[in-house]
Amino acid sequence: MLFRSSAYQKSPVGCLFYDFFGGNTLKADVSISVTELGSLLDHTGPHLEAEEYIARAFGAEQSYMVTNGTSTSNKIVGMYSAPAGSTLLIDRNCHKSLAHLLMMSDVVPLWLKPTRNALGILGGIPRREFTRDSIQQKVRDTGGAQWPVHAVITNSTYDGLLYNTTWLKETLDVPSIHFDSAWVPYTHFHPIYQGKSGMSGERIPGKVIFETQSTHKMLAALSQASLIHIKGNYDEETFNEAFMMHTSTSPSYPIVASIETAAAMLRGNSGKRLIQRSIERALDFRKEVQRLREESDGWFFDIWQPEAVDKAECWPVAPGEDWHGFKDADADHMYLDPVKVTILTPGMDEQGNMDEEGIPAALVAKFLDERGVVVEKTGPYNLLFLFSIGIDKTRAMGLLRGLTEFKRAYDLNLRVKNMLPDLYAEDPDFYRNMRIQDLAQGIHRLIRQHQLPQLMLKIGRASWRERV
């Protein structure tokens, strides 16, 4: 046995490391040679018990713990489901790990093309892409392609759009479907997500459904904690070969323990309450921003959402509505997750119409960053925030306070030196006498001059030949 925890205490710098992380954390980082703990690679002992427990919690027939991230989980599922020489359908809005899978495997990809609005938000793959006629046309247009044996779909999108997975599972004519659900490991634990996740509902005859999740995203688990869930008949021995190919023989036991802990936190009514609190926190924040916008003198931030957000639900991206900015949206197809909050800044509407004046979101993101508020994603005029189970009222109010402080400072037209000191420090000569409104309008004019939103849409059409 390797006594790594004791080894740290053999040197001064090691003692500092030991004191920072604590003895229990380092003592838990044991060697795979500890037979009492079983094996992650062979799925024996406590590891097997944990995976069976997790499967029951997440509504799967079988679950696998992965200690090097969903990037690895995606490759495991792909290498099992799409053998060399086969053809697969793959979301053009896929994670880089799936692009790496294509580089590693001798497979033929048929791209499923998502829509995109002027804000830069991906709207999911339209229903027309999933029809037999559309898939057959892709096969005819792609050299070496055959009818696909597997499909990969990103659910949800980064911005929080979820598919009607019940329809997809019943409609898509392939033997196996993989939902890359890295950002939504919580969907099984609240009724508003019913029919919008891979493991939702009963098994589909003749199909196997895979769902990969980043347990450390949005839940309580250590970084690189990931899960593979399976529903349907599959070859366990062959699957485990792919699992072992991508799994270290020295897995991190603290990561394993954190995955099982995350499952335990979510089981039963206590888990539902955790997710319910996140949803309520996000809804309260959305309503407060809308209230401030209605009461504000002049401008204030807006939120990308329907007009009525009175109750906990996933809001449909319905055809004929302007708020989402997607042309030809399908009915009962895509839904907005309430815990994924996109803030809109002045300057452009959802249809891509530019105003004379505007506040590029990058300036707001910089202001918030200098105050310790993490922005998940920044577009030209939008910012994404995630309301995970770790977000409490204090943090939510901290974000709201940051937005109101930005408005106050912007309306006072403070100097960049005083409002964004870190930005000023990057080039004092350039920003010396500049005020925030001058900087904002200068960037906004450049965006208008070069027609950035339209250019981004053209890039999308050039890459995907997509009509947005």
Annotate each language-model stretch with its function.
Residues 70-293:
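Conserved PLP-enzyme active-site core in the AAT-like
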Residues 49-63, 182-193, 201-208, 317-328:
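Short N-terminal secondary-structure initiator segments
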Residues 50-53, 141, 198-200, 214-215, ...:
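Intrinsically disordered, low-complexity boundary segments flanking structured domains
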Residues 66-67, 252, 378:
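Alpha-helix N-cap/helix-initiation sites
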Residues 17-21, 25-104, 110:
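Long, structured ligand/cofactor-binding scaffold of large enzymes
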Residues 37, 64-66, 151-154, 384-388:
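Short glycine-rich or small-residue beta-strand-to-loop segments that form or flank ligand, phosphate
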Residues 1-39, 44, 56, 269-468:
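Non-catalytic terminal extensions of PLP-dependent enzymes
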